[in-house]
Curated annotation (Swiss-Prot):
Gene3D superfamilies the record matches: Aldolase class I
Enzyme class name: lyase
Organism: Pectobacterium atrosepticum (strain SCRI 1043 / ATCC BAA-672)
Pfam families reported for this sequence: His_biosynth
Biological function: IGPS catalyzes the conversion of PRFAR and glutamine to IGP, AICAR and glutamate. The HisF subunit catalyzes the cyclization activity that produces IGP and AICAR from PRFAR using the ammonia provided by the HisH subunit.
Top-level division of the source organism's lineage: Bacteria
EC number of this enzyme: 4.3.2.10
Active-site residues, Swiss-Prot/TrEMBL: D11, D130
Catalysed reaction equations from the record: 5-[(5-phospho-1-deoxy-D-ribulos-1-ylimino)methylamino]-1-(5-phospho-beta-D-ribosyl)imidazole-4-carboxamide + L-glutamine = D-erythro-1-(imidazol-4-yl)glycerol 3-phosphate + 5-amino-1-(5-phospho-beta-D-ribosyl)imidazole-4-carboxamide + L-glutamate + H(+)
Sample GO molecular function, one term: imidazoleglycerol-phosphate synthase activity
Subcellular locations according to the entry: Cytoplasm
Family: Belongs to the HisA/HisF family.
Transmembrane segments: none
Protein name: Imidazole glycerol phosphate synthase subunit HisF
């Protein structure tokens, strides 16, 4: 069995790490490189960096900090933000990123997933899905341009359909960003994760809602995800990654402990 992964998420805006609640009202957390170093030293399995306004601003992720991160950490990291071409992805990988993630650009051009997978291999291609639960209808819908709350829009895709579509097109991994849970720290949406797990045959990463060590355990044992991504509990030092991994190991989760 492959070890489960603990993945800190660093949302980047204007060269700094920020964090919001339900993708809104972002506050500055700190500088990119020191935070990346800290998480690597604490025992993170990999890092994810989202340049959250790149797509809504119509630009690609700022590459200047990608190479600086690559110089100071020795764990894999994934970069996302406005990547719309094979060439842009190649630049980010050449700067030292191990994976690239696409979200809004994939919704605008689904064939982009295939072009990237064909060029760089599915192991490098992550698709992020920003999913919102509509309580009135009980449905889960995919949102686009979520980095800018003035431009965020609900797409015509229902979440499960889009999960199946991106796999057909070559996604090597899926990060499910559950917007209702984002930043509120009351647990991952296990019901939604189980629905997605049933149709997801590639590694699935849960994102949005972690507030306690038990929430990570629930995601692994109840929803059988491959990795758990979190931000505010790590940024605010509510949970230490090393202590979290020791706890998970004690609970029988297969995980790498430093």
């Amino acid at each position: 069995m492959l070890a489960k992964r603990i993945i800190p998420c660093l949302d980047v805006r204007n060269g700094q790490v920020v964090k919001g609640v339900q993708f809104r009202n972002h506050e500055i957390i700190g500088d990119i490189v020191p935070l990346a170093q800290r998480y690597a030293q604490e025992g993170a399995d990999e890092l994810v960096f989202y340049d959250i306004t790149a797509s809504s601003d119509g630009r690609v992720v700022d590459k200047s900090w990608v190479s600086r991160v690559a110089e100071v950490i020795d764990i894999p990291f994934c970069v996302a933000g406005g990547i719309k071409s094979v060439e842009e992805a190649g630049q980010i990988l050449s700067f030292g990123a191990d994976k690239i993630s696409i979200n809004s650009p994939a919704l605008a051009d689904p064939e982009l997933i295939t072009r990237l997978a064909d060029r760089y291999g599915v192991q490098c291609i992550v698709v992020g899905i920003d999913t919102w639960h509509d309580a009135a209808t009980g449905r889960y819908h995919v949102n686009q341009y979520t980095g800018d709350e003035t431009r965020t829009k609900v797409t015509t895709w229902e979440t499960l359909d889009w999960v199946e579509e991106v796999q057909k097109r070559g996604a090597g991994e899926i990060v499910l960003n559950m917007m209702n849970q984002d930043g509120v720290r009351n647990g991952y949406d296990l019901h939604q994760l189980n629905l997605v797990r049933d149709v997801c045959n590639v590694p699935l990463i849960a994102s949005g809602g972690a507030g306690t060590m038990e929430h990570f355990l629930d995601a692994f044992q109840t929803a059988h995800v491959d990795g758990a991504l979190a931000a505010s509990v790590f940024h605010k030092q509510i949970i230490n990654i090393g202590e979290l991994k020791q706890y998970l190991k004690q609970q029988g989760v297969e995980i790498r402990v430093c």
